[in-house]
């Protein structure tokens, strides 16, 4: 499964990783709805990677791209 690196409008200077069923490098720059905390946020896809520094079973699934 591809891993999306997502930038969120937060006072944290880091990217957040989410798994996606279908994603490609063409999705870079697109907005995506992702779970964050108790709600959802809209972020921007910065990168599509094959792996993450976190175990894949700990990553949440991204929503609609």
Predicted regions and their residues:
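Accessory, non-ATPase domains that flank or precede helicase/AAA+ motor cores in DNA-metabolism machines
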Residues: 1-65
């Amino acid at each position: 499964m591809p891993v999306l690196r997502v930038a969120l409008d937060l006072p944290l200077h880091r990217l957040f990783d989410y798994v996606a069923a279908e994603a490609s490098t063409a999705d870079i720059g697109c907005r995506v709805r992702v779970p964050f905390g108790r709600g959802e946020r809209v972020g921007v896809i910065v990168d599509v990677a094959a792996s993450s520094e976190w175990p894949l079973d700990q990553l949440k699934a991204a929503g609609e791209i």
